[in-house]
Amino acid sequence: MLKNDRLLRALRRDTVDRTPIWLMRQAGRYLPEYRAARQHAGSFLKMAKTPELACEITLQPLRRFPLDAAILFSDILMIPDAMGLELHFIEGEGPRLGKPIRDAAAITQLAVPDMETELRYVMDAVRLIRKELDNSVPLIGFSGSPWTLACYMIEGGSSKEYARIKAMAFNAPDVLHQLLNTVTDAVISYLAAQRAAGAQALQVFDTWGGILSPTMYRTFSLPYLTRIARELERGTGTEHTPLVLFGKGNGPYIAELAMSGTEAVGVDWTIELEDAARRSNGQVALQGNLDPATLYGTPNNIAREVQRTLDSYAAGNGGSREGHVFNLGHGMTPGMNPDHVSALVEAVQRLSRR
């Protein structure tokens, strides 16, 4: 039995003694111990593909901060890599795929990876982390969204314009839907395998959904998020594994996401939580949404923004703070001060106490 199940209870909108907190990219380059591990390992991929290293990095922030969850150390591009697109990282530039998708013929050759062979290192990491956590806090598994993964698979890496995938959306939408359906199958299998290996909550990162127009979002992102929420087996009762759909720029679609079948919606800092709570109409829990740049402020300013965020959620949720998981609106960045993270966690724990 979990010693700290605040996250899972909040995701079910049950009563908690205070608002739970975890942070996207809580294991990352802002921590000196992460930088030391990265230097010792020699590459990001070695860390991500070695279960013992992935476990160590997952646990690093838990040793520093009294967080309410661990999140698997990995990368959303492990699925495309396992599909044969050859993931590698270029220093200062980020991820690159050596064999990007350029036409329909390449899509027909894609297959859903076998999770216990091509992605066994991920599942072994999940099993090892669960063992090391010893039921102290829940472990979150994750995947990129179909749209976000397709962006990388077609562009070959990060992009400012996403011209190739947008051209495909306009000129060959059937081809893009074929890719998105295959990727959705892979995401569902991947999340199910993480759950079977021991993940106790799951999150989908729709990082690039916000680059789409409303019509395009409702065509190329939302239907596939909904399919994941409705088709991913998550169990019942005490064996239930809640799902969070997080997206940058998803504010206009919260009402629709709330009806997708997910347990929670994660939002960025470009919408007030009060508005998000009203739009979700009590159908889902909400996760977020402090602007990550707040952590560049003083501890007093951080505490002030924590209070404002907590109050904003309650104002849109009938005065109640239940059903809220405190998080940033996006991930931690390398230049952040770990002491300010401590101040953030302390402020959330103190100010959200029921």
UniProtKB/Swiss-Prot annotation:
One of its GO terms (biological process) is protoporphyrinogen IX biosynthetic process from glutamate. The record marks 75 as: Transition state stabilizer. It catalyses: uroporphyrinogen III + 4 H(+) = coproporphyrinogen III + 4 CO2. InterPro entries: UROD/MetE-like_sf, Uroporphyrinogen_deCO2ase_HemE, Uroporphyrinogen_deCOase. HAMAP family: URO_D (MF_00218). NCBIfam families: hemE. Homodimer. This is Uroporphyrinogen decarboxylase. The lineage of its organism: Bacteria, Pseudomonadati, Pseudomonadota, Gammaproteobacteria, Lysobacterales. The gene is hemE.
